[in-house]
Amino acid sequence: LKRSDRITSDYSDASATLAFDIKQGSWSREILQRLDVPEEILPECYATTEPIGRVTRAAAEATGLAVGTLVVNGGGDQIMQAIGAGAVNPGMATVNIGSSGQVCFQCDRPIANPRLNTNTFCGFSKERWITMGATMSAGLSLAWFNSLFPHTDYEELNREVAKIRPGSGGLVFLPYLNGERTPHVNPNLRGMFVGMNPETDRYQLARAVMEGVAFSLRECLEVCWDLGLTTSELIASGGGARSAPWLQIQADVYNLPLRVSAVEEQAGLGAAIAAGVGAGIFKSINEGCQAAVKYKEEMYLPSKVNHELYTEYYQLFKEAFSATRGVMERAAQLGRATGVYY
């Protein structure tokens, strides 16, 4: 919805198009010319905290906002998520489980990855960048699984999953329901369970789903670590941060402490902080984070014993992928041939 009389973008979203000159901070005329895209159809680009107009009468009637309210540019979802989580300085990182999942590192320079299996975006200022690894089906995997058992709510699921020992009784889940981004960049991968037996129950399967998503996010972390990025802890966000067993699974799989934001909608908080800077309420993003970002008291600390066990399961996870990659791709091909378009 257009709230002011200007159509704009910010540097983070613009940089995600691959048609943005990050050195000049403007659209790349060379790329646009090669693609035959007229520059005049693209929005003007400004910083995340830049005021770009005021609420028009039409927008006020549609939203209930007051006419003349200041409109600040804002930014891409992961940039706002990082601000709302307080991960705004180099060496800080977030792990997000929504429908998809992301690991995002705050950087003071653009990180080039010759393997092309991560994303690097402009950040909320010229001194900040985000490097991101992403898995396609994180919370989506658990939502899909739970939809098969409509009488089980998430509270019950979490309670029962917490009772199951790490490893889910020898199960491994490959969470490739929608293909995969980091590290495989392959739309033709498909999900599967490995290791089921007659004693396997739905709660073991559910825990295996959580563990499989965590293994996939560990792959994202390892790609970022190979690029020289490090962190001493992760700030958890998204719907996955509401699940205590899933948080503990992640801490054990990554061998890193997890801190949890007190606010569930971190991207919304990040947008509010950016607006506060643009409106002059805060002098900087850092000041806004100090004033507004809070964390829950409980941190999730990794268990050495569980991490060692999960390292074995993680190797099995990767071996299962290598052994079945061709099978998954063939299954996707046959599915499309029989009218299943995904």
Regions inferred by a protein language model and the residue ranges of each:
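Active-site core segments that coordinate phosphate-bearing ligands/cofactors
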Residues: 1-9, 13-14, 18-36, 46, ...
